[in-house]
Amino acid sequence: MNYLTMISLALLVMTGVESGVRDAYIADNKNCIFTCYRDSYCKTECIKNGAETGYCIWIGEYGNACWCIKLPNKVPIKVPGKCNGR
């Protein structure tokens, strides 16, 4: 049993699992994306919300939208479905 625990722990360390963060399209509390035209805007918004960095994805799945790297789980992200505010 100890071997199984040690192997599992080693795999987690080797794969670099970071709990509490993810890469995603940042959204407001109404599931609306942050529309962008410049990387600097997204970088500012992402960092302000606790991400490592961010950039603008042009003509992506949701149009021109901000993509954040290592965004905390507490920050809303775009989920499938409509924007409820526009």
Swiss-Prot record:
Gene3D superfamilies on file: Knottin, scorpion toxin-like (3.30.30.10)
Annotated S-S bridges: 32-83, 36-56, 42-66, 46-68
Top-level taxon in the UniProt lineage: Eukaryota
Family annotation (InterPro entries): LCN-type_CS_alpha_beta_dom (IPR044062), Scorpion_toxin-like (IPR003614), Scorpion_toxin-like_sf (IPR036574), Scorpion_toxinL (IPR018218), Scorpion_toxinL/defensin (IPR002061)
Keyword DNA damage part of the UniProt annotation: no
Alphabetized Pfam families for the sequence: Toxin_3
Domain LCN-type CS-alpha/beta stretches: 22-84
Keywords per UniProt: Amidation, Disulfide bond, Ion channel impairing toxin, Neurotoxin, Secreted, Signal, Toxin, Voltage-gated sodium channel impairing toxin
Tissues in which the protein is found: Expressed by the venom gland.
Signal peptide from the UniProt entry: 1-19
Gene Ontology terms describing biological process: defense response
Location relative to the cell: Secreted
A molecular function GO annotation: sodium channel inhibitor activity
Listed GO CC annotations: extracellular region
Modification Asparagine amide occurs at: 84
Protein's job: Binds voltage-dependently at site-3 of sodium channels (Nav) and inhibits the inactivation of the activated channels, thereby blocking neuronal transmission.
UniProt remark on domains: Has the structural arrangement of an alpha-helix connected to antiparallel beta-sheets by disulfide bonds (CS-alpha/beta).
UniProt family annotation: Belongs to the long (4 C-C) scorpion toxin superfamily. Sodium channel inhibitor family. Alpha subfamily.
Record protein name field: Neurotoxin 8-related gene product 1/2/3
Organism expressing this protein natively: Androctonus mauritanicus mauritanicus
